[in-house]
Structure formats: C-alpha cells, structure tokens
C-alpha cells in the first residue's frame, strides 16, 4: 500500500498551515488577569497554572492581545517554554496580538454621531496611527516571535482596530496594511522567522462582510497581504442590537425548555455562519482566496443590563455552553479555527460594574 508523504517540519514544530483549521489544535482567546486592573498582571507561575488547565481541556492554541503595553504575553511564552522543557510532549501555541490604535486614541472628547465628528477636545485622528505605540507593539511581536519560534505561530495586527464603532481608537485599513506589509517584509528579509503567519483580527464588517463603507482599495490590498483572515462574529451582542434572529417563536413557546432554547441557539449559530460566509463572499468577489478563521466570538454567562433578564435574556451559562458546543462542532467539521472568547472571566474589563457582560465571557 502506498503511504502518505511525510510532513516535513522545521525544528520549530508544526507550521501554521498544520495548526490553523486542524481540530486537533483547539483555540481559545486568553487573558490571565486576576484583578480589577491590568497593572498587576499574572506571574509566570500563575500562567503555568492556566495553561495546564487549558491543555487539560484540549486547548493547544491561544490568542493574546498586546505585546509591549503589558508583560503578560512575554510571561505566557515563558510559561509555555517551561512546560515544554519539563514535558517535551506538551503542546501550546500562540497567535500573538499586536495592539494597534489611532493617533490621540482615548483622548477626552465627545463624539457627535449625527455629524460623524468630535465636538470638543483633540479626539482620535483615525487617518493616522499612534506611531510610538504601534511600532513598539509590532517590533516587540517580532522579537518575541524570534525568541519563541516553536510557540508563536501567528501575529495578529490589531484587534477590532478597523471597525468604526470603536470610536476611541479605530484606524483605517491603510494603517493595518502598513504594519502587515512591514511584517511580511521582515519575513522576506529574515528579520522575522518565516514560520509565522500574519493577519489582522477584526469584525466581519471590517473584512467586507457588511456595510459597503469598508469596501475600499486598501482593504483589498490587506486581503492580498495577509496569510489568512481572522474574523469576529458576535450573535450575543446582536441579540440586543440587531435581534431579528433572536428569541422564541410563538410556535415554540409550548416546547420543553431545552428544545425551545436549542432552537433559539440554532438560529444564533446560523447568524454567526452568515456573517462568516459574508466575508467569504466578499473575498470571492475580489478574486482572492485565503483561509478564513474565526478570530473571536463568545457568549457571556452574566449581564445586568442589555443582555440579562431585563434585556434580551441571552446571558446565562446554559446558552453559553449551547453556543460553544454548537459552534465548535461546526468549525471542527469545516476545518475552521475558532478562537472562543474567552478562557477565563476578567474583572478588569468593567471593574466598576461587576455584573457587566464584558466581565463574564470566560
């Protein structure tokens, strides 16, 4: 019998193409902050505890969000290296996030949505990036990828950095494109290990799947420049903001709870699939063919306002598990990596409001 050709790997272990889309490498978005601020980040020892838990769950690929602003990413890589040294069979890989933001992000100003402008203060300049922050994030990503080439398998340039509802910090695609091209040039010159894929992780609309305001020449060039596309989809949030798919139909009201809720969650999954497909459709219109993975989606277990019992009633542990199980089954079958948001609850997300949904996606 003919044997399949062997996979030729470098000393750095499996390649991104062997990991992404492979259900043997389950993915998760990760933040290990225990407290109500990020000032006191987790220690390497605490991160070792976390990755042992995640590994026991079958998670082998983590996504982070910053490189230079906080020490967590570098400590996480050190924690993984320690585990690998102690147990050579231990596997955990990382998609390293580099935070990208506009010039004057987080400035004190008031946004006038009707006129699409800031009415006081300097406000962010969305046409330019924060050069100091962004260059530090990217150059630190290069350093970490080179220091941990057996662990870092991808670099994501920006997190929801192009979606225009991120009014305090978003940039236009040309800024993301600049840094993606910078990383690709670094790979070509040997300044960055070649065994790392480059992407940007953003809302499905930012990747052309919705509002045509995003359909620009710069976005087309970005599609061409990345090694794969990382898409975000959040039916949970749209259960309140765009609830056409959400809720129990009159014909379902008499059904048992599990069946009734299951049908509701099936529609949430269909909604997520539709957003994913919209990106594929737009990319196809451009004549571009790249792998598309889900860089972020999730479901909160608690909310005291819009998504809780007085709102869309989406937030609870039962629906969280139902969403996770259904979406994970589909992505495994389709060969799509799913970075589920997120591994653990993080109190710093909205420290002044303990019941806010952002604190309860873990």
Pin down the residues of each PLM region:
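N-terminal Sec signal peptide cleavage junction
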Residues: 3-5
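Aromatic-rich peripheral "rim/lid" segments of glycoside hydrolase catalytic domains that contact
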Residues: 7-19, 23, 305-362
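Alpha-helical scaffolding within the catalytic cores
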Residues: 10-15, 49, 75-78, 136-143, ...
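Substrate-binding cleft of extracellular glycoside hydrolase catalytic domains
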Residues: 12, 74-196, 294
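N-terminal carbohydrate-binding/catalytic regions of secreted carbohydrate-active enzymes
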Residues: 13-109, 131-138
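Hydrophobic faces of well-ordered beta-strands that scaffold small-molecule active sites
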Residues: 26-30, 60-64, 90-98, 153-157, ...
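The substrate-binding groove and active-site-proximal loops of carbohydrate-active enzymes
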Residues: 35-41, 59-65, 97-103, 120-132, ...
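Noncatalytic carbohydrate-binding groove/subsite architecture in carbohydrate-active enzymes
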Residues: 129-133, 153, 162-294, 300-304
